[in-house]
A protein has these predicted regions:
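Bacterial N-terminal signal peptides
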Residues: 10-22
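Bacterial N-terminal signal peptides that target proteins for export
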Residues: 1-11
Length: 396
């Protein structure tokens, strides 16, 4: 697997794109971290308990200790996404071109539903609308075989059952300005759902852009938003819309920066500008950004830098959406090698602090950080050994 295809394309986003899975301010005593791993065939997704008072994961002599049994996925599970109420979950299985569905057992572990749902070629990212009516799946395709990527849309039924909507998968339609007359074969990498309105945004690594679509709330059908194609930096690899603001951020792995946008009421994007100028705001970030996530209130944004082996933190201006990097000595922290995904979980107390987790694909470890909410300070806890080649990660 290439470095690019080895990076998580979601986040889950989210309901999101690098996928935001937090229980907000819940004081529940039961909390879990879920980790999808690619080191076996088929892959697995495993639950681990979180001690919310300490941020520690269930472990023994530095090795994660699972809750219950690991559930099997398809081959090479990448994105891992829960529904908003955390009653079922999905993995995008890049190697077997399908989606696995899971329900949650009483002990917090996952149980795989019978059968899998066929996706397009090489599904790499997942996102869901806030009402959990639709699952959006980015299929990478294979440009080397002249097979461009696209987006599959599934309606979500009882127990998380999936049914593909009419006319799915939907093409990216990259034949209009501002791209060249003959653009490169699209290579979509990530997807995010807007916090307001029925819009999704898909990054295209090959053409250096993000594409906007509206989705029909009844049928799930996709249509281009006005303008549709918005140029960003080199090799966009992650896209994220915070859960408490109508902003969009695109992290570019080739130029190591973040493009910042306001989502308009029609789904089109307007570049956020630096203070007192008309210059589009572009935030510098770590080497090879692969995933993004924020807290529930969208006070902070965190970026996993895959090649820089670190997490980089930013404050989000609640009015303008402008990102400001937190001081390096408190807001940037080292991870294990090759972080590909992020998860965040409230510590359940009244102080509002959080625990932040990274899935480190290169090191086969999980990193944990305490997030001091008043300052954005990240304090590392000991890394723990994980199953081989961990990928998607989520917390509940």
């Amino acid at each position: 697997m290439s470095i690019r295809s080895g990076w998580l394309r979601c986040v889950a986003v989210l309901w999101f794109l690098v996928f935001f899975l937090s229980c907000g301010g819940s004081s529940s005593s039961s909390a879990f971290l879920y980790l999808a791993s690619q080191g076996t065939t088929p892959g697995t997704v495993t639950a681990y308990s979180i001690d919310l008072s300490k941020g520690t994961l269930s472990s023994n002599t530095g090795q994660l200790t699972p809750v219950g049994k690991a559930a099997h996925t398809g081959t090479q599970p990448s994105a891992l996404l829960f529904n908003p109420t955390h009653t079922f979950a999905y993995t995008a299985n890049t190697g077997s071109d399908d989606i696995s569905t899971f329900t949650v057992n009483k002990d917090g572990s996952l149980a795989a539903a019978q059968g899998v749902t066929a996706a397009g070629m090489r599904p790499v990212a997942l996102a869901m609308d806030s009402s959990a009516h639709f699952l959006f799946v980015v299929n990478e395709g294979n440009p080397a075989q002249n097979v461009g990527g696209n987006v599959s849309v599934f309606s979500i039924g009882s127990g998380g059952a999936l049914a593909e909507v009419s006319n799915s998968p939907f093409p990216l339609r990259e034949t209009s300005p501002p791209l060249p007359v003959t653009p490169a074969q699209p290579l979509p990498t990530a997807v995010a759902v807007s916090n307001q309105g029925n819009f999704i945004y898909v990054t295209d690594r090959n053409n250096g852009c993000v594409l906007g679509f509206s989705f029909d709330g009844t049928s799930g059908a996709l249509s281009p938003v006005p303008g549709q194609i918005f140029i960003v930096g080199s090799a966009p690899n992650a896209v994220y819309s915070p859960p408490a603001a109508n902003f969009l951020y695109v992290a570019n792995a080739g130029s190591n920066d973040i493009y910042e946008f306001i989502i308009n009421s029609d789904g089109s994007l307007t570049a956020i500008t630096t203070v007192g100028t008309t210059t589009p705001a572009v935030a510098t970030t770590g080497n090879g950004p692969a995933a993004m996530i924020s807290d529930q209130a969208a006070k902070y944004l965190f970026v996993a830098a895959n090649q820089g082996n670190e997490v980089v933190g930013y404050t989000i201006n609640q009015v303008t959406g402008l990102l400001t990097q937190i001081a390096l000595n408190i807001g940037t922290a080292s991870t294990g090698a090759g972080p590909v995904a992020l998860a965040i979980r409230s510590n359940g107390s009244t102080n509002g602090d959080y625990w932040l987790f990274t899935s480190n694909n290169g090191a086969s470890t999980v990193s944990t950080f305490s997030l001091v909410y008043t300052t954005g300070t990240l304090n590392p806890l000991p890394q723990l050994a994980a199953p081989l080649a961990p990928y998607g990660v989520a917390a509940r």
